[in-house]
A protein has these predicted regions:
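Sec-dependent bacterial lipoprotein signal peptides
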Residues: 1-25
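A broad, low-specificity signal marking well-ordered, structured residues that form hydrophobic/aromatic
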Residues: 5, 71, 83, 92, ...
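Short acidic/polar N-terminal linker immediately downstream of export determinants
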Residues: 11, 22, 26-79, 97-115, ...
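Extended, compositionally simple hydrophobic/Ser/Thr-rich segments
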Residues: 50-63, 112, 119-261
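Solvent-exposed adhesion/ligand-recognition segments of exported proteins
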Residues: 56, 83-89
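Short carbohydrate-recognition loop motifs
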Residues: 91-97
Length: 261
C-alpha cells in the first residue's frame, strides 16, 4: 500500500510539472515589470463622431471638453501596448489587456484623459475611477446616459442636461453627480450610494432595489420607489412627491423615504 501511494504521489508530481510546462510554453511573452510611467497621445479619425464611451478593468478616466477628440494614456511603459482603444459604431472602447497581474506591482498609474465634445453615453464595467474636469459639456445636453453594469470605483460627473438617465445594476461604485437636469431618472441596485444632492432636478424619479441610498434634489415633482433594504432621501422643499414601497416592511427593515434636510 505504501509503494502504491508513493507511486501515485510521484505520478501527481510529474503530471503537475508537465501541466505547468505546457501552460508556460503556451503563454505569450509578457514583461514582468510595469516600467517607468510614460504618457502617450492617441488621435482618431476626425470624420468619426464619438458619442459613447465603454471602459473596463482598472482604468481611471477623466473627461475633458475639447474640440479635438483624442486621448492621453499615462501608465507603465511595459503596459502601454496592451491598453487598447478602439472605435466602433461611434463608441470608444478602453480596455487593459495586460496579463499576469499577480506577478507585477499594483502601484502603477493607469489614467486616461478623454478629450471630447460629443460623449453622451457612458457604460462602466470597471474598478477604476470616472470623473469630469469641469462640466462634461458647457452646452446643455439633450440626453445623457450613465450605465454602471458592475464596478467599484468612484464616479464624479458635472452635468447640464435636459434628461439624465442613471442606471446602477451591480457592484460597489460610489456615484456623485452635480449640475442641473430638467428630468432625472435614477435606478439603484448596488451596494453603495448615489449622491445627487448637488444636481438640481426639476422633476425626477428615484427607484432603489438594494442596500444603500439615493440622495436626490428635486424642485417640482419626485416619484420615489423604494423597498425595505435601501433608502431615498430628498429635498423637503419639493412641491410634490409620490412615494411607493415595493415590498412589505420586514422586522429588521432599514429603508426609508424621507427628507435629508
Amino acid at each position: 500500500m505504501l509503494i502504491a501511494t508513493s507511486q501515485f504521489s510521484a505520478f501527481n508530481r510529474s503530471l503537475f510539472i508537465i501541466l505547468i510546462a505546457m501552460f508556460v510554453s503556451s503563454c505569450e511573452p509578457a514583461p514582468l515589470t510595469n516600467g517607468k510611467p510614460v504618457t502617450e497621445t492617441r488621435q482618431f479619425d476626425d470624420s468619426i463622431t464619438i458619442t459613447s464611451l465603454y471602459f473596463y478593468n482598472d482604468i481611471n478616466v477623466t473627461l475633458i471638453e475639447d474640440e479635438e477628440f483624442r486621448i492621453e494614456i499615462t501608465t507603465g511603459e511595459n503596459l502601454m501596448e496592451k491598453i487598447t482603444s478602439t472605435v466602433e459604431n461611434g463608441a470608444l472602447y478602453l480596455k487593459n489587456e495586460n496579463i499576469r497581474y499577480w506577478l507585477r506591482s499594483y502601484d502603477y498609474p493607469l489614467d486616461v484623459k478623454v478629450y471630447h465634445n460629443s460623449i453622451r453615453h457612458i457604460n462602466y464595467v470597471s474598478w477604476g475611477d470616472l470623473k469630469s474636469e469641469g462640466p462634461v459639456s458647457q452646452d446643455t445636453i439633450n440626453h445623457f446616459d450613465l450605465i454602471v453594469e458592475h464596478g467599484s470605483g468612484d464616479i464624479d460627473l458635472n452635468l447640464n442636461c435636459k434628461t439624465l438617465n442613471i442606471k446602477a445594476y451591480d457592484g460597489t461604485a460610489k456615484i456623485t453627480v452635480t449640475g442641473y437636469s430638467d428630468y432625472t431618472d435614477i435606478y439603484h441596485n448596488t451596494r453603495n450610494n448615489i449622491y445627487a444632492k448637488d444636481l438640481i432636478s426639476k422633476n425626477a424619479k428615484a427607484h432603489i432595489d438594494h442596500e444603500g441610498s439615493i440622495y436626490v434634489n428635486c424642485t417640482n415633482k419626485l416619484e420615489a420607489i423604494g423597498n425595505h433594504f435601501g433608502s431615498i432621501y430628498y429635498n423637503r422643499h419639493v412641491k410634490e412627491i409620490n412615494k411607493t414601497i415595493t415590498q412589505s416592511p420586514a422586522p429588521n427593515s432599514r429603508g426609508v423615504i424621507e427628507p435629508y434636510n
